[in-house]
């Protein structure tokens, strides 16, 4: 089982089902309950980026058409240029490169999920999280977004909606050809309940791997403690 802790500055808010009170980060960087107990005493601290998370769970084959050409320094520079050009064209209300993170608590671990949304903007009263992908593919032929790209945007959308108490949230997938600069967009909107269930299912899957990691670590540490060393120090 796991639960989500909202991260806001140096203070973490626990969702209603938790009964341990708010979590506070002290000057030493330790997480404490308001009662003064060390909350993370026996939890393994794990970290993963949003991109690595969704690629670990969903990736199937080549998602970015990363030929040697696409991985060249010139291609990476072109990708950065396209990102900035698209972000700059979206107007003053467009927030670019928004850092987002939260802590997901499992029985044996606390997992920090973090990354940067390419952009967040509001249109006609609706909020969208933008995920920009530059590539050499003919984007006009895309009939739907690449699944793992969509999952990345949905993770950011969930975190943003959670931390801002939003009832609905949208995602926009922006695909741009690096040579022609032709652009194609895909949009979806979700209720908070829909995107929360999606994220919960995602974390349930990753939680199996995280729990396995923690169990292996705990077994290894227990074995080390049982070793008899020939000399006392």
Regions found by a protein language model. Name each.
Residues 166-233:
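ATP-dependent helicase/translocase motor core
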Residues 89, 93, 163, 206-209:
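Solvent-exposed amphipathic alpha-helical surface segments
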Residues 43-48, 145-147, 231-233:
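Structural motif
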Residues 5-9:
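Cationic, amphipathic, low-complexity segments that mediate targeting or membrane/lipid association
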Residues 102-196:
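Mg2+/Mn2+-dependent nuclease catalytic core
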Residues 2-4, 16, 23-126, 151:
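Metal-dependent nuclease catalytic cores that hydrolyze phosphodiester bonds in DNA/RNA
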């Amino acid at each position: 089982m796991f639960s989500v802790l909202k991260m806001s500055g140096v203070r973490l808010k626990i969702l209603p089902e938790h009964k341990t009170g708010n979590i506070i980060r002290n000057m030493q960087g330790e997480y404490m309950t308001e009662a003064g107990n060390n909350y993370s005493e026996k939890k393994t601290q794990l970290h993963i980026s949003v991109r690595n998370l969704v690629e670990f769970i969903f990736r199937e084959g080549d998602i970015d058409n990363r030929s040697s050409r696409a991985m060249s320094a010139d291609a990476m520079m072109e990708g950065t240029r396209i990102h900035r050009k698209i972000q700059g064209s979206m107007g003053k209300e467009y927030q670019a490169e928004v850092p987002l993170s939260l802590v997901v608590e499992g029985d044996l671990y606390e997992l920090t999920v973090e990354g940067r949304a390419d952009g967040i903007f509001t249109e006609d009263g609706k909020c969208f999280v933008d995920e920009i992908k530059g590539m050499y593919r003919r984007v006009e032929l895309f009939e739907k977004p690449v699944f793992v790209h969509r999952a990345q945007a949905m993770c950011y959308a969930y975190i943003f909606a959670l931390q801002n108490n939003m009832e609905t949230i949208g995602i926009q997938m922006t695909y741009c050809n690096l040579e022609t600069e032709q652009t194609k967009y895909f949009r979806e909107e979700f209720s908070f309940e829909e995107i929360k269930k999606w994220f919960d299912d995602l974390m349930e899957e990753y939680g199996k791997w995280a729990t396995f990691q923690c169990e292996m670590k705990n077994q290894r540490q227990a074995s080390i403690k049982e070793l008899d060393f020939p000399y006392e120090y």
